[in-house]
């Protein structure tokens, strides 16, 4: 399909990425409609996918996506947890509509539902796990693009992109390459290297992320709390001036009023006793 155009040919860098992500590894069984994409069969029974055919179908899918006038009418779907991050990233860069997680039955056929949508094109991660939107798309004549393994059913699938759909890295890499080709056809990026790395499309287990964060915190050096520095004023050269300035600066507390206070310590400061009350027994004689 790419012909002799060097721009559309498969680059060595892309082949290296595919091999590192195990995109070429199929399954032990093969669908009769996927036999045309199988390169050979290993001795252990695993089928090897032809990466040249994979890239050709990827370019064909990118041309179909770029032909849609409004990018929001392209729906990217993944009910498998390993492909949800890739779907969200793809929708972010291409302005598509993502459906990550469980697909609501009847979203394409039941107009009474609040989640009713009318997309012009569907892209699914795996037609085996995303069979519900693929089946509903066949009822309303919506074309479907799907990433298919050697054993994936291709019924109601218009464009099948052969790849390894059981590997988290393979799924993320294929979504990344599809987004890159779509942006190139739209003229958003050049045919040079795209600054977005494929790692952003890979699935990350939350538990593994927490373990990595804990390991980083454990390896970081422990910084003890350092007390604040005490600011000490410079000693004055003249003690008289310092005492005067300190006395003027510090407010003096008001003296407590003490009843009957005397300057002479020898005098008795005891207050005289109050006169006794009249006796209840009668008047004194």
Swiss-Prot record:
Biased composition annotated in UniProt, kind: Low complexity? 271-285
Q: Which residues form a coiled coil?
A: none
Which key words tag this protein in UniProt?
Cytoplasm, Ribonucleoprotein, Ribosomal protein
Q: Where in or outside the cell? A: Cytoplasm
Predominant location:
cytoplasm
Q: Which GO terms describe its biological process?
A: cytoplasmic translation; ribosomal small subunit assembly
Matching entries from SUPFAM superfamilies are given as:
Ribosomal protein S2
Give the matching InterPro entries: Ribosomal_uS2 (IPR001865), Ribosomal_uS2_C (IPR032281), Ribosomal_uS2_CS (IPR018130), Ribosomal_uS2_euk (IPR027498), Ribosomal_uS2_euk/arc (IPR005707), Ribosomal_uS2_flav_dom_sf (IPR023591)
Q: Name one GO cellular component term.
A: cytosolic small ribosomal subunit
What pairs make up the disulfide bonds? none
- Residue ranges for the region (Disordered) are 262-285
Q: Spell out where the chain crosses the membrane.
A: none
A Pfam family matched in the record: 40S_SA_C
Signal peptide range: none
Which is one GO molecular function term here? Answer: structural constituent of ribosome
Family per UniProt? Belongs to the universal ribosomal protein uS2 family.
Self-association or partners: how does it assemble? Component of the small ribosomal subunit. Mature ribosomes consist of a small (40S) and a large (60S) subunit. The 40S subunit contains about 33 different proteins and 1 molecule of RNA (18S). The 60S subunit contains about 49 different proteins and 3 molecules of RNA (28S, 5.8S and 5S). Interacts with ribosomal protein S21.
Q: What does this protein do?
A: Required for the assembly and/or stability of the 40S ribosomal subunit. Required for the processing of the 20S rRNA-precursor to mature 18S rRNA in a late step of the maturation of 40S ribosomal subunits.
**Name under which the protein is recorded:** Small ribosomal subunit protein uS2
Q: Which organism is it from?
A: Anopheles gambiae (African malaria mosquito)
Its ancestry begins with: Eukaryota, Metazoa, Ecdysozoa, Arthropoda, Hexapoda
């Amino acid at each position: 399909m790419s012909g002799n155009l060097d721009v559309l040919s498969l680059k060595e860098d892309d082949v290296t990425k595919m091999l590192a992500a195990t995109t070429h590894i199929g399954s032990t069984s093969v669908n009769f409609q996927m036999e045309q994409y199988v390169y050979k069969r290993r001795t252990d029974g695993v089928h090897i996918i032809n990466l040249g055919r994979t890239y050709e179908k990827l370019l064909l899918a990118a041309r179909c996506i770029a032909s849609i006038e409004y990018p929001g009418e392209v729906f990217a779907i993944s009910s498998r947890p390993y492909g949800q991050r890739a779907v969200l990233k793809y929708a972010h860069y291409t302005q598509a509509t993502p459906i990550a997680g469980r697909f609501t039955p009847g979203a394409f056929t039941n107009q009474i539902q609040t989640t009713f949508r009318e997309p012009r094109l569907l892209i699914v991660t795996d037609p085996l796990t995303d069979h519900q939107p693929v089946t509903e798309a066949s009822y309303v004549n919506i074309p479907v693009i799907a990433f298919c393994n050697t054993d994936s059913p291709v019924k109601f699938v218009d464009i099948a992109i052969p790849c390894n759909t059981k590997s988290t890295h393979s799924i993320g890499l294929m979504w990344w390459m599809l987004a890159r080709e779509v942006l190139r056809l739209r003229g958003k990026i050049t045919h040079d290297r795209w600054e977005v790395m494929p790692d952003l499309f890979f699935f990350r287990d939350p538990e593994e992320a927490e373990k990595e964060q804990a390991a980083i915190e454990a390896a970081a050096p422990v910084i003890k709390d350092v007390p604040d520095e005490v600011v000490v004023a410079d000693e004055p050269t003249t003690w008289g001036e310092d005492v005067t300035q300190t006395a003027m600066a510090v407010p003096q507390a008001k003296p407590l009023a003490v009843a009957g206070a005397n300057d002479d310590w020898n005098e008795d400061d005891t207050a005289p006793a109050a006169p006794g009350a009249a006796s209840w027994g009668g008047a004194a004689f």
